[in-house]
């Protein structure tokens, strides 16, 4: 398991009762790679969870795009990430992702954790590629 995923899993366990939203759970572990302090990355992601607080674009995806942009990745890499997410989940909209989760009988936490952990692994791979 990569160190990003280990830290992401720790944050999603809500250490000390502190909730890290989906965006923060990616931005904080990747802070060093994008030239940020963890505290700044935490603050940056504060209002991107729960689809920017109103069920819009998935915070996991928006955080991943911020990370790719700050890491200097190209538009094609970002577009492919969005397209792959859309193909896998049928939507990029938090509200729709959560509705589909409820229909399957999966808890919101289980669903969001899965999205965050999967994206963490994808980001770790993308950030090590030379493109």
Model feature map: region roles:
Residues 1-15:
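Polybasic, low-complexity association/targeting segments
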Residues 28-32, 66-72, 121-125:
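Short glycine/serine- and small hydrophobic-enriched flexible loop segments
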Residues 21, 25, 39, 43, ...:
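Conserved active-site and cofactor/substrate-binding residues in soluble primary-metabolism enzymes
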Residues 45-52, 71, 82, 87, ...:
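Acidic, glycine-rich active-site loops and adjacent beta-strand->loop/helix elements
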Residues 2, 76-131:
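C-terminal binding/interaction regions
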Residues 27-45, 88-97:
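Acidic-glycine-rich active-site phosphate/pyrophosphate-binding loop
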Residues 27-31, 45, 49, 65-66, ...:
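Amphipathic alpha-helical segments within well-ordered protein domains
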Residues 48-70:
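Glycine/serine-rich anion-binding loops at beta->alpha junctions
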